[in-house]
Amino acid sequence: MKIAIIGHGNVGGALAKNWAKSGHNIIIGTRKAQDEKAAQLVAEHELIKTAPIQEVVATADTVLVATPPQVATALARSWGTLPGKVIIDATNAIWQQPEGYDTAYHAFADITKAEVVKAFNTTGFENMENPQYGDTTADMFIAGDSETAKEMARKLANEAGFERVYDFGGGDKVKALEHFAFAWINLAIMQGEGRNMAFKVLKK
């Protein structure tokens, strides 16, 4: 599968490396020819390449967005309509929001008409690199109205090492999933528990 990564910071970079190890072709969208972070990722794995953002979005099967949320509306408008393409929104509009929307998910869904899912936003990038904790793994959580996009997110989460993926619900639950992400940020960073922590659902 060809996966476009838009936003190759900590989260995007971690998932790019993880999915490349699973055999996917990763194309990192860049705005400039000389991009040190992108070049470092390319050097780490032969299945990671770079190309201009518009090109990678047009040619990829799935697009992961891990940018600051406030640029989502402009990105979506620049891409136009993308019927049938899967977009995974890994942003969190907690302190800043996209122009005209509460979340990046809603901007992408409304403007591009793509198959959109919220995922990979509720834990730190360290867990994107390795979600293993002893003999168990961190859980992943998804939300959105597209079953096609959810199925893709489940598949990619499993391949990244997340054994269990829980469905938070439809597009009306996306903001709740961002609040859930803030719970991780609060515990890990603000309350000093450390970034090597994750959420796990326990059942009796």
Residue ranges and their predicted role:
Residues 96-97, 106, 130-151, 155:
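Short beta-strand and adjoining strand-loop segment in the mid-core
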Residues 43-46, 82-83, 111-112, 160-161:
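Short, structured coil segments at secondary-structure junctions
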Residues 54-97:
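Rossmann-fold NAD(P) dinucleotide-binding segment
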Residues 6, 140-204:
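Active-site-lining helix/loop region of Rossmann-like oxidoreductase modules
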Residues 91-134:
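Rossmann-fold NAD(P)-binding glycine/threonine-rich loop
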Residues 1-40:
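NAD(P)+-binding Rossmann beta1-loop-alpha1 motif at the extreme N-terminus of oxidoreductases
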Residues 47-53, 166-169:
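Short acidic-hydrophobic, aromatic-tinged amphipathic segments that line or gate anion-handling sites
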Residues 23, 59-61, 162:
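Short, well-ordered alpha-helix to beta-strand connector turns
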